Amino acid sequence: MELQKLYSKVRQAVDAYQMIEDGDKIAIGISGGKDSLTLLYALAGMRKFYPKKYDVVAITVDTGVGNMDFSKVKELCESLNVPYEIIPTQIFPILMERQEKRMCPLCAKLRKGAFNEAALRLGCNKIAYAHHKDDVVETFLMSQVLEGRVHTFSPVTHLDGTELDLIRPLVYVTEAEVRGFTRRYQLPVVKNLCPVDGATKRETAKRMLARMEEEFPKAKSRIFAAIQRDHIDGW
């Protein structure tokens, strides 16, 4: 995917759901994966021409899984003129030591807490997650199969008990487009060393949708359109 196409799709989502206002300071959550680096590239570049003036910072919460090297991410941030902060934690070793049964949800909760705290400390009023179009559909499927309810995450959410709004500017971008952009612009993806990476319920949902598309081409796009048409969870 070309950079201009990325800008176009992100701007469409930002405008449709009024994600950015004048004076916003947005903290971008950087895991080092393809999605978060693509979001970083988009929001950093759009500062040059988007009519509403805003600023961004990048934050990585290092959970203490192995020896993950974010030096190339730091170089990318410097090239994009984006301040970058790494928050060191011992989240993963502590969870392993306690032998937590539901480690993934608890890890996510602790990471989000550390990220939100850093965002507020840096003077941010918004945070940005790199959930893309496929994530919306996968969450929709998982909610029905695992929870028995019709639900997915919203493009914009106010975080209760905080002064932060959460925005998801990549919701019009497919995972395939993110993957293509990452290759085309050689983004410095950091390998995820978490031992349960790729063995989650979301990966199962991803495979289910892939099989569905073999039988029903464009199934994901049509599910996404249904979510929007029925205004499910703020869409």
Give a label for each model feature.
Residues 2, 6, 69, 174, ...:
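Alpha-helical structural motif
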Residues 11, 15, 44, 210-213, ...:
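A short, amphipathic alpha-helical segment
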Residues 33, 131, 213, 217-220:
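Generic detection of long, well-ordered alpha-helical segments
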Residues 56, 126, 134-214:
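Catalytic subdomain that performs nucleotidyl-dependent activation
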Residues 200, 206, 218-235:
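A short, charged, Gly/Pro-tolerant segment at domain boundaries
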